[in-house]
Swiss-Prot record:
Pfam families with a match to the protein in the record: fn3, ig, Ig_3
Residue ranges of every copy of the Ig-like C2-type domain listed in the record: 40-147, 148-235, 244-336, 342-429
Name this polypeptide is given: Interference hedgehog
Extracellular topological domain residue ranges: 27-702
Native organism: Drosophila mojavensis
Length: 897
């Protein structure tokens, strides 16, 4: 096989260029970026985290991936712009910018930023794996600030002993949230006196005269360490004497927080301020939350309700009822909102789609506040794509899928608490460009003629670039396709690969296996034909590139586009994939079976991209054939191109971009056996009103078919019976009318008499053995003739002479011995009795004992008996043996008829 390539036309180069744009490495499921996942595949293990820092500090953003990418990039959007758009920070610009430094080390990239007003904003990490870009969640860089009230305010409270005092020091705006320090008579108080909220509330439970004094506070920014002394002051007086009774009420300037925001899992304290005399007690209730007060997570305090381990169901309205027995009681209504970071509950899912088709990708997320959903296509926001549309439900609509959409599509859900992301691989099958498409009609005449000549020749349409999936530490699985085309037929494929991470460029290695194309033409409804093959003998922890070489019917070849760089990682670094379980294998046709399987859990669908099916005849020990089943949601698949009536063994394997699962258990299935009977089997057919062509076969009703077949069989039986009967009669007629060897029979038979139904039968046989009995014999003959005339019997009979057997000892060897007179007389009497019995219809067995069986059958024939023609009754002479031949000239004097 020659691998030398000839001249390529401009359409072929254009086809190659378009194929490069749409070639994909593998299905890369992008899992949640804000938490490491146990699933396999390429993902962001550690995304950059948001940071608040003072001006001039150095901040380091760290991004770590599960596999080393080809290269890292960082994108940045400034918060100073009204509509920020992310831009890539190029390495060259980073070197020239002293505020930004990028360092990459295998699978970790670090971005060092000096906090300046121009560097504040959002940052993303982008890991490139060939043409695919996996983007991290957003990290914000914010400046540490703190500010508060500047108006001095003094509060004078007079409270009866035993009450609980709650004082808010003031309102501050701080990023991050500040810490508070309280002072009593300019002496710092223990931290336990401060409640754990950002409003700076001072708690003084069960005040006494010792609690009287002056109180102040200071707020401190935890990031910058900046302290802010609040101008508010509290003068508290607790008299020792009893005060008059009073209903519960708020102190002057005291406020109630009617809305409390807290994160899920935290502990929150709902305050119920108010004093009275005697000191009131608080009673809590909630009309929205059933059992919200009295459970193992709540605690009722004199000054509030404490709820631990917040859950979304704790959101609602809480009512505090302060009562000391004096009316009116004091009520506070507090709204608790449990906030939750966004979490994607329905990630997007996409498979191979054709260029120009309409596509909808869905993504659903939960969170409080309701998260906002946006999409990235290979790191670029979908709002800048002219073919995309974002409806209110958060899905992504691609009105016409383009080649630029191929790659990693990610859905991001975002609210004030953070972000979550999930992604899928979108594969785009480009529109096939045939030779001569898009070429103008103008130009020189010679060029036009050359182009017209080129258009008449069939082109070598190359296969697509292979998708690569890891199978083991030393093998990968390649998947590619060939679009339906009118080009030259492909005979077989070859796989080529080379290592790319070594310093010296290595040559392409070619596998020994010839991968057959199969049928030379696509099926009518098959737009794309998929192929699968494995490559073994690779080295782990190295990068490879792959390509497919197609050999055509003209014995020339053409290679596909090269795959992206694929890093073959050791299996120890990858988490195992779910193993599918084969449930059933059903007969589908004589050449196909249907596989049915399931996964241990439907949640495992997010970890895989599809399945590999392996099969071979159970009686064979050869290599397994392979088939690829795209889509993690698939639970059945049709395996075709099998042999009729053959038992096959099957096993399945799930796969993702970077790994494959263990094999499922083997299971056997059989294709349908060929039909050995011509009886039509009842099948379901759709109604077709079109006229069938000459090569189409009608499917008749089984009842009608059986009726016609039975009638035809009955007619054949009747005809056969008639033919057999006629043949039998004809055979009997031939036996009676056309007797063979007539001349010989005349010599051996003696005519008895003519026979006619209208004439009396005269049977007379006289055998005179000696002259002495001749006279007596004549008298017997006359009497016999008279009896024959009276009987008028029309029956026909044949009488054969009974041969006389003589003893050899009496006759001697030469047969010349003379018989005694007594023996002759006994013979005479025997014959006379026989003759008399034959004439009167008596027993004639002695005379007819040696009659030929065939002759007797002829006599009994109705055809012969009914004949009106005169017949001859002949009696066959019995031939004597050599021992009795002397009788003719001896004692036997005459035989008369």
């Amino acid at each position: 096989m020659s691998v030398t390539r000839g001249h390529k036309s401009t359409p072929s180069l254009l086809l190659l260029f378009l194929s490069v744009l749409t070639s994909l490495l593998a299905a890369i499921p992008v899992l949640q970026a804000n938490a490491p996942s146990a699933g396999p595949g390429v993902r962001i293990l550690r995304p950059p985290e948001s940071t608040v820092a003072p001006s001039g500090d150095e901040v380091v953003f760290v991004c770590e991936t599960s596999l080393p990418p080809e290269h890292f990039e960082w994108s940045y959007a400034s918060t100073r712009s009204h509509a920020p758009r992310f831009k890539y920070l190029k390495s060259s610009s980073a070197k020239n910018n002293s505020n930004i430094t990028i360092t990459n080390d295998n699978d970790i990239s670090k971005l060092r930023v000096i906090v300046r007003p121009e560097t504040l904003g959002e940052y993303r990490c982008v890991a490139w794996f060939g043409p695919l870009a996996v983007t991290s969640t957003t990290a914000r860089l914010e400046l540490a600030t703190i500010s508060g009230d500047k108006i001095a305010q003094r509060s004078n409270w007079r409270v009866a002993a035993g009450n609980t005092v709650l004082w808010q020091c003031g309102q501050v705006v701080s990023n991050p949230a500040p810490t508070w320090s309280f002072y009593y008579n300019d002496i710092e108080m223990p931290a336990a006196s401060t409640l754990s909220d950002s409003s700076g509330t001072l708690l003084l439970p069960h005040v006494s005269t010792a609690s009287s004094g002056t109180y102040t506070c200071v707020a401190t920014n935890t990031a910058s360490g900046q302290r802010l002394a609040m101008p508010r002051r509290l003068e508290l007086q607790v008299p020792s004497a009893a005060l008059p009774s009073a209903a519960p009420a708020l102190l002057p300037g005291q406020s109630v927080r009617t809305e409390v925001l807290a994160r899920i899992g935290e502990t929150v304290l709902l305050l119920c301020p108010g004093v009275g005399y005697p000191p009131p007690t608080a009673v809590w209730s909630s009309p929205d939350v059933t059992g919200a007060v009295y459970n193992n997570r709540t605690r009722v305090l004199p000054y509030g309700l404490q709820i631990g381990g917040l859950q979304p169901k704790d959101t609602g309205t809480y009512i505090c009822y302060l009562d000391n027995g004096i009316r009116p009681a004091l009520e506070h209504y507090i709204q608790l909102v449990v906030q939750q970071a966004p979490r994607i509950v329905r990630p997007p899912s996409a498979n191979l789609t054709n260029e120009g088709e309409f596509m909808v990708l869905e993504c659903a997320a939960t969170g409080t506040p309701t998260p906002k959903i946006y999409w990235l296509l290979n790191g670029e926001n979908s709002v800048y794509d002219t073919e995309s549309e974002l409806p209110a439900n958060g899905s992504l609509i691609l009105r016409r899928v383009q080649k630029r959409h191929a790659g990693c599509v990610q859905c991001f859900a975002r609210n004030v608490l953070g972000e979550d992301s999930a992604g899928t691989l979108l594969q785009v099958n480009p529109t096939q460009i045939q030779a001569g498409d898009g070429m103008g009609t103008g130009g020189m005449g010679r060029s036009s003629n050359r182009n017209a000549h080129n258009r008449k020749q069939k082109q070598m349409v190359p296969p697509s670039a292979p998708n690569v999936t890891r199978l083991s530490d030393e093998s990968v699985m390649l998947r590619w396709h060939v679009v339906k085309n009118d080009g030259l037929h492909i005979q077989f494929f070859k796989v080529q690969y080379r290592m790319t991470d070594s310093g010296k460029r290595k040559s392409w290695q070619t596998t020994n296996e010839n991968i057959p194309y199969g049928k030379q033409r696509h099926d009518s409804d098959e737009a794309v034909r998929n192929f699968t093959s494995s490559v073994t003998g690779l080295r782990p922890d190295h990068s490879y590139r792959f390509r497919i070489m197609a050999v055509y019917s003209n014995n020339d070849n053409k290679e596909s586009n090269t795959s992206g760089k694929f890093f073959l990682q050791r299996g120890a670094a990858l988490a195992p994939l779910p193993v599918p379980e084969l449930l059933d294998i059903k007969e589908y046709s004589q050449t196909a079976v249907m596989l049915h399987w399931h996964l241990p859990s439907d949640a495992d669908e997010q970890l895989i991209s599809g399945y590999y099916a392996y099969y071979r005849p159970s009686a064979s020990a050869g290599e397994y054939l392979k088939a690829t089943i795209d889509g993690a949601k698939a639970r059945s698949a049709l395996i075709s191109a099998l042999e009729p009536g053959t038992i096959y063994e099957f096993k399945l394997q799930s796969f993702s971009a970077m790994a494959a699962s263990e094999f499922s258990s083997l299971k056997q299935g059989r294709t349908q056996r060929p039909r050995s009977s011509t009886t039509a089997q009842p099948t379901m057919h759709t109604v077709d009103t079109t006229t069938p062509t000459h090569n189409e076969t009608f499917n008749m009703n089984p009842l009608l078919t059986g009726t016609i077949s039975g009638g035809a069989l009955l007619i054949l039986l009747v005809i056969s019976a008639c033919l057999c009967l006629c043949k039998r009669r004809h055979s009997r007629g031939d036996n009676s009318q056309n007797k063979p060897r007539l001349a010989e029979l005349r010599e051996d038979f003696v005519p008895l008499n003519t026979c006619s139904p209208n004439k009396p039968r005269t049977r007379h046989i006289h055998i005179t053995l000696n002259p002495l009995a001749q006279q007596q014999q004549q008298q017997l003959q006359q009497q016999h003739q008279q009896d024959e005339k009276d009987s008028q019997d029309n029956e026909l009979g044949y009488f054969q002479r009974q041969p006389v057997v003589y003893d050899a000892e009496t006759l001697g060897f030469n047969g010349l011995a003379r018989m005694s007179s007594s023996s002759l007389r006994r013979s005479q009497r025997t014959l006379e009795r026989a003759a008399a019995g034959g004439g009167s219809g008596g027993n004639n067995n002695n005379l007819n004992q040696a009659t030929d069986a065939s002759l007797a059958a002829s006599l009994d024939s109705p055809r012969l008996q009914a004949s009106n023609k005169p017949g001859r009754v002949i009696l066959k002479r019995s031939r004597l043996s050599s021992r009795s031949e002397n009788l003719s000239s001896g004692s036997l004097n005459s035989v008369g008829v």
